[in-house]
């Protein structure tokens, strides 16, 4: 049985168990059966894509600015989340978990990370941070343009982070420095998916593992994701908008 067929089979079994659940993150799901079923299905999905890992990956300091698969998956995950949030559709929440995990695996493959590592990092983060990261990924390939924040058209660095957190229900100031100052500083070892990642003159969103980020860098490039170079990674600091001071 494929992972997807297994997932479909478990939907009905899990639905009643989690009907009253309002989860902050996957680890808080009330149903042990739903939890175990989803973990098994996601592990199977990971095994299906891991074989592509080495051939498709890029190196540290390189970025992916053209990935329609990730863009479509991220938008689908956010759509499922909204159905759950607005209507309490628990099947939609299960779909959100599945598609979010698929998106994490694709990002991992393209950046040379272990899919399971990125999937776990996203699952353990706040739902707000998950949504912000996914929102930013829906804009991969959109051109950089200074002083702009227009979905599907153009972004500068703080325009992208503001847009992403806006879709998660959090308003941020406009400039990169103001955004960094408005959020609560986080030690690197405690940084989670969606956290603001700042160095002087530039701001990004953390994708939960090592120095993996999504950002809108400079003129002539697009919204992209990848890992920072070792030199650059040593300069960044992290901040969490959900615990702003």
Model regions: which residues?
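Intrinsically disordered, low-complexity
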Residues: 24-143, 230-245
């Amino acid at each position: 049985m494929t992972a997807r067929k297994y997932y479909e089979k478990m939907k009905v079994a899990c639905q009643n168990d989690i009907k009253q659940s309002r989860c902050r993150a996957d680890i808080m799901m009330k149903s042990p059966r739903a939890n175990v079923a989803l973990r098994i299905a996601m592990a199977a999905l990971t095994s299906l894509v891991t074989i592509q890992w080495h051939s498709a990956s890029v190196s540290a300091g390189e970025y992916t600015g053209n990935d329609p698969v990730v863009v479509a998956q991220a938008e689908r995950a956010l759509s499922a989340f909204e159905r759950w949030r607005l209507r309490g559709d628990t099947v939609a929440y299960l779909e959100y978990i599945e598609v979010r995990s698929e998106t994490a695996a694709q990002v991992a493959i393209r950046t040379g990370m272990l899919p399971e590592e990125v999937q776990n990092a996203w699952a353990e983060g706040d739902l707000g941070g998950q949504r912000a990261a996914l929102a930013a990924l829906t804009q991969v390939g959109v051109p950089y343009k200074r002083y702009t924040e227009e979905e599907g058209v153009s972004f500068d660095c703080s325009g992208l982070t503001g847009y992403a957190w806006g879709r998660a229900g959090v308003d941020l100031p406009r400039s990169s420095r103001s955004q960094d100052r408005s959020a609560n500083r986080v030690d690197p070892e405690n940084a989670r998916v969606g956290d603001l990642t700042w160095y002087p003159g530039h701001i990004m969103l953390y994708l939960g593992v090592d120095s993996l980020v999504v950002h809108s860098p400079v003129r002539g490039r697009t919204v992209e994701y990848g890992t920072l170079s070792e030199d650059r990674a040593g300069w960044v600091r992290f901040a969490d908008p959900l615990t702003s001071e």
